[in-house]
């Protein structure tokens, strides 16, 4: 699979960047629809997004480089080249949420209400962005036989044929899981729910899916023998369950 979509004056435009851009566009469209449905101010959400998204990208890169520094030790300038991949979603989520919290506090906005609205958009963007990994030939699982890969569409088979072997398309599993979670989150958001339910569901369900899918991957970031994404996902599941217990007793219901 050619990772380069086209070139302009010798400058290569890669599918990885295109898929991230499409994910952002889809996320903003869905956020606008959700704001209209609830009567929220979309402009306020955009104000937060314009600050938190760039910091999320930086966080995703920093997170990846920290755990994969051996790849950059001899050429530190490569740290700034994200066109070939190397963005960790967990880092983006942590930095993005942190930035959004600070901005929302500064602007005296309701952080929980804000992210209840935007959580479906985040997971939709992730679902689309995962296809950038497909074009880069990364975020896949181990070697599989033709009998297994033949069950997938032909373009998936071709994309997962790398250096003479077929690989398990784990990026596809996560993308589909993210779409399912997105549908669930939109449904919850548009019904009456307790404040914080949507973002809590996002953290819990995404972490649950990522925990199991990560176990199939061959390029996981590691701490010793522990997969970092599985560790963070486990923490996310625990936090989500804890917050649901809190919501059951004290959360406020919103329209």
From Swiss-Prot:
EC number(s) from the headed UniProt entry: 2.5.1.145
Top-rank lineage group of the source organism: Bacteria
UniProt-recorded Gene Ontology molecular function terms: phosphatidylglycerol-prolipoprotein diacylglyceryl transferase activity
Protein's pathway: Protein modification; lipoprotein biosynthesis (diacylglyceryl transfer)
Class of enzymatic activity (EC top level): transferase
TM stretches of this protein: 15-35, 46-66, 84-104, 169-189, 196-216, 228-248
InterPro entries: Lgt
Pfam name, any one: LGT
Keyword Membrane: yes
GO CC, one annotated term: plasma membrane
Bilayer disposition of the protein: Multi-pass membrane protein
Keyword Lyase: no
Record family assignment: Belongs to the Lgt family.
Function: Catalyzes the transfer of the diacylglyceryl group from phosphatidylglycerol to the sulfhydryl group of the N-terminal cysteine of a prolipoprotein, the first step in the formation of mature lipoproteins.
Protein name, UniProt field: Phosphatidylglycerol--prolipoprotein diacylglyceryl transferase
Organism, scientific name: Clostridium kluyveri (strain ATCC 8527 / DSM 555 / NBRC 12016 / NCIMB 10680 / K1)
Gene that specifies this protein: lgt
């Amino acid at each position: 699979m050619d990772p380069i979509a086209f070139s302009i004056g010798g400058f290569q435009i890669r599918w990885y960047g295109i898929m991230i851009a499409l994910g952002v566009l889809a996320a903003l469209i869905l956020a606008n629809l959700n704001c209209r449905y609830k009567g929220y101010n979309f402009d306020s959400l955009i104000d937060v997004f314009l600050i938190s998204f760039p910091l999320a990208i930086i966080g995703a890169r920093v997170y990846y480089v920290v755990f994969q520094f051996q790849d950059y030790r001899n050429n530190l300038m490569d740290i700034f080249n994200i066109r070939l991949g190397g963005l960790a979603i967990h880092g983006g989520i942590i930095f993005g949420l942190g930035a959004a919290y600070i901005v929302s506090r500064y602007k005296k906005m309701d952080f929980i209400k804000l992210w209840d609205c935007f959580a479906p958009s985040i997971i939709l963007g992730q679902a689309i962005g995962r296809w950038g990994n497909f074009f880069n030939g990364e975020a896949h699982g181990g070697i599989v036989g033709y009998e297994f890969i033949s069950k997938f569409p032909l373009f998936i088979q071709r994309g997962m044929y790398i250096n003479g072997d077929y690989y398990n398309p784990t990026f596809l599993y996560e993308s589909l899981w993210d779409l399912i979670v997105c549908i669930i989150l939109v449904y919850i958001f548009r019904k009456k729910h307790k404040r914080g339910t949507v973002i809590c569901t996002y953290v819990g369900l995404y972490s649950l899916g990522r925990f199991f899918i990560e176990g199939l991957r061959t390029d996981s970031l590691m701490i010793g023998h522990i997969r970092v994404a599985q560790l963070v996902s486990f923490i996310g599941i625990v936090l989500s369950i804890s917050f649901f217990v809190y919501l059951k007793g004290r959360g406020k219901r919103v329209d």
